Amino acid sequence: MFQEMIRQIQRAETISYTGKIENIVGMSIEASGGRAAVGDICQIYNGDAGGQVMAEVVGFKNDHILLMPYSDMSGISAGNFVRNTGRRLSLRMGPFLKGRVINALGQPIDGKGPFQGGTLFRVENNHYINPMTRPPIRERMEFGVKAIDSMLTIGKGQRIGIFAGSGVGKSTLMGMIAKNVKADINVIALVGERGREVLEFMEKDLGPEGMRRSILVVATSDQPAMLRKQCPSVATGIAEFFRDQGYDVLLMMDSLTRFAMAQREIGLAVGEPPVSRGYTPSIYAELPKLLERSGNFQKGSITGVYTVLVEGDDTNEPIADTVRGILDGHIVLSRRLANSNHFPAIDIGASISRLMADIVSDEHKRLAARVRDVMGIYEKNADLVSVGAYKAGTNPRLDYALGKMDGINQFLTQGVDEAFSYEEDLEAMRKLL
């Protein structure tokens, strides 16, 4: 108790720096006077309404401080006072977060009451992690999804991307993973989601079983860009807290594209030049800083699953291309497979786990290679077969593939309420071939 009092005294504000608003353009607020550093939290006092708006320092322009608000700016006007709190965004961490839903400021929004106690944890996306402190990834993380565990095996501490257009089963796959994965705890960030989809994801995709060992961090599409930008950092900070307690954490983020869009809004508002498709240079600095926070560590691990929305199913658009180069593999969801009622709609040929060869047995590698070989032969000749131009017996390898494809497709499909162990997957692959 005495030590806590000392910490409170050390954190107490002894000097208060104030300024006033000079200009507002779009979502950017310019203030003069006072002192501040990038990342400081400021309070804007709305004199007429008697309220306060929290904002973060995002840059400087001449002698003015540039601020971006965490809430609606309605009622703010030139001349309003701005006070620098001298603090950074922090939230309380503890076991009480399990099964809860919070916003991007760490405040509970599920109606289950406020948090009590816990450890105050600063949320920042500027941690440098010494690469020499990262042990090699040698253990599997079982996802309970056949197509992933058998053909795209993922290790504890690996970072994988799910690349998908809209409406191909991305949220459903995330729910399946959250329910079936052999992780100690799930941390799920929903960035820029439609408001109605949050509860729908909890009840339909995640379910009570998945929710019990999950923590949801939510910033909906109608909230300010600062909240949508902070949401992934808050979720990653929570994952880091539990990792330091020795947990193997699954961190899921939906989606990195909306995080990049929020950063684009902020960058354009403070005067950054647009580069590729309107994205600003800061995005390409923020993405690796965020993604490198996941991984395998001495005490625990953070296995990252990040979704990327591909515009017009173009997997080579700027954000998708950048993220693919940072992550340790990618899972591509195919609209063609989804349209043929093949779920999860994972395109095995277009997907890869870069660490699979290091974490599975030689037998598993041989079986997976044979399945890929059969699928590749079939795909290469699919048009020939579909128009009836192929004559059986002409190509023995194609004949073999045609005889196996129905079984392979059946093996790679899975119901949302089904779960399979790694051993069951291996046995099924042996029988397939």
Write out the residue ranges for each language-model feature.
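N-terminal accessory targeting/assembly segments
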Residues: 1-109
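Phosphate-interacting basic helix/loop segments used at nucleotide- and nucleic-acid interfaces
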Residues: 2-5, 9, 85, 143-148, ...
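Residue-level signal for pocket-adjacent positions within structured domains
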Residues: 4, 84-86, 104, 119, ...
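Flexible glycine-/small-residue-rich
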Residues: 23, 33, 46, 59, ...
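P-loop NTPase nucleotide-binding/switch module
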Residues: 80-82, 89, 96, 109-158, ...
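P-loop NTPase catalytic core
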Residues: 150-151, 157-433
